[in-house]
Amino acid sequence: MSQITDVYAREILDSRGNPTLEVEVFLDSGVMGRAAVPSGASTGEREALELRDGDKGRYLGKGVEQAVSNVNDIIADEITGMDATDQVGIDKKMLELDGTEFKSRLGANAILGVSLAVAKAAAEEVGVPLYQYIGGCNAKELPLPMMNIINGGAHADNNVDIQEFMIMPAGAANFKEALRMGAEIFHALKSVLKGKGYNTAVGDEGGFAPNLKSNEEALEVIMEAIVKAGYKPGEEVLLALDVASSELFENGVYTLENEAESKKTADQLVDFYENLVNKYPIVSIEDGMAENDWDGWKKLTDRLGKRIQIVGDDLFVTNPSILKEGIKKGIANSILIKLNQIGTLTETLDAIEMAKRAGYTCVISHRSGETEDTTLADLAVAVNAGQIKTGSLCRTDRVCKYNQLLRIEDELDDVAQFRGHEVFYNIKK
């Protein structure tokens, strides 16, 4: 029996200099699993609650000492003695302990830290890599990365409305080559921006964050960088957007300050997207509508859902019950998976399974506030998700996930699969 003997949480810092939790779970064999919890900037209102202390005299109110205490004084007592390989049972025990819909008593950050640390300890005990422990013997697909190379919106202090402009090296033969292509385009983009006199400082997720003349100019400079790096847009490299539209939505109107006609209805916003899709090799749009604008989501899905990937992030918040409703109404065709939106590994896996059964694609994602924890890289391979979104090609908090995927690809050797364009199995290409 892989019995839990001790659980310990501490307060650490994330990539934005804000506190977060790190949890260690110890087993009777002496092995230990450690996990750190990420944090988002643009968050869905139905996400599980990230518990913060609110003491303005300490870390500007963002401390997590209460969540740490909840792990050390409440959760630890309840799960000590349980078998670490009983992931479902341990996660269920923590949900019962919390007893609230959005994990507001103990905090999703407290619960998730324990959930992931338990899985890591169990994998160590069994003697297999984390991706294999979670996914079994068929975990073998390396994900196509969505690389965020221009940051805007809530992720950057600039005038760009759209939060993320991403490249997807779908023409690569394997993950290692995809990463190389992305890095080369990233450096080419820096050169392009410098040549135009733009600032090349980076945002929260490592992408460049210049002030640009329009949102479309971001696409133009990326296209130029792809060609400068020696690749063919639309064949070897595709584009993806995360609009984070909930941040732009108020009183039934979307406001894009950097557009000539800044105020847009849902219909006008769909027209705006369709125009971009017709002009550029955009294969994916995330959060194209606000999380509560389900009518807008339906219009977007009906118009573009057969041509491109329509990803729900704030819309679904990795919540199986919300996803189920979206599937029933024909909303979106893909889900973004963020571990801390729902708060346990078990519920995350439930959401992924539900999405796949409905023919939705899954994109495993980081948060804008990250740590050196690489769990999501293992998760992407464990569930054969096919896609991962973990930032740009700089900042260790982003690059560590890519480096972990390189290790996994090496370990899998000739068993490893990389599907490139084929990951978009539910749209016409």
Curated annotation (Swiss-Prot):
Location, primary (coarse class): cytoplasm
Entry note: cofactor: Binds a second Mg(2+) ion via substrate during catalysis.
Pfam families noted in UniProt: Enolase_C, Enolase_N
Reactions performed catalytically: (2R)-2-phosphoglycerate = phosphoenolpyruvate + H2O
Active site, renumbered: E205, K338
Biological or metabolic pathway of the protein: Carbohydrate degradation; glycolysis; pyruvate from D-glyceraldehyde 3-phosphate: step 4/5
Cofactor: Mg(2+)
SMART domains: Enolase_C, Enolase_N
Keywords for the protein's UniProt record, in alphabetical order: Cytoplasm, Glycolysis, Lyase, Magnesium, Metal-binding, Secreted
SUPFAM superfamilies associated with the record: Enolase C-terminal domain-like, Enolase N-terminal domain-like
EC number, UniProt record: 4.2.1.11
Annotated TM spans: none
Gene Ontology terms: biological process: glycolytic process
Chain residues that bind (2R)-2-phosphoglycerate: Q163, K338, R367, S368, K389
Superkingdom as given in the UniProt entry: Bacteria
GO cellular component: cell surface; extracellular region; phosphopyruvate hydratase complex
Binding site for Mg(2+): D242, E286, D313
Stated role: Catalyzes the reversible conversion of 2-phosphoglycerate (2-PG) into phosphoenolpyruvate (PEP). It is essential for the degradation of carbohydrates via glycolysis.
Listed name of the protein: Enolase
The species this protein was found in: Citrifermentans bemidjiense (strain ATCC BAA-1014 / DSM 16622 / JCM 12645 / Bem)
